[in-house]
Amino acid sequence: MALAIEAKRQILTGNQRHKTDTGSPEVQIALLSTRITMLTEHFKTHKKDHGSRKGLLTLVAKRRRLLTYLRDTDPERYKAVLLKLGIRR
């Protein structure tokens, strides 16, 4: 499931470090978290969609790697991202 352009733009503006930032870990984690939430809602009605479930696990693993990178490089930004996005870790 892809994000709509407006939804993606809204996520970007809320998590950018500067005006043209699209690749910082904070932005990537926020985008992945939104996609994970969308897929989780999808699975509430489509329990046997195993192909998409594999995609969900891939997204969760990618977000986990980005969070680990952010924790190791800048713990303050890491804590801020966890609080802002409500991620339990």
Swiss-Prot record:
It comes from Solibacter usitatus (strain Ellin6076). Pfam families: Ribosomal_S15. Belongs to the universal ribosomal protein uS15 family. GO terms for cellular component: cytosolic small ribosomal subunit. Part of the 30S ribosomal subunit. Forms a bridge to the 50S subunit in the 70S ribosome, contacting the 23S rRNA. This is Small ribosomal subunit protein uS15. Gene3D superfamilies: 6.10.250.3130, S15/NS1, RNA-binding. One of the primary rRNA binding proteins, it binds directly to 16S rRNA where it helps nucleate assembly of the platform of the 30S subunit by binding and bridging several RNA helices of the 16S rRNA. Forms an intersubunit bridge (bridge B4) with the 23S rRNA of the 50S subunit in the ribosome. It comes from the Bacteria. PROSITE patterns: RIBOSOMAL_S15. One of its GO terms (biological process) is translation. The keyword RNA-binding applies. GO terms for molecular function: rRNA binding; structural constituent of ribosome.
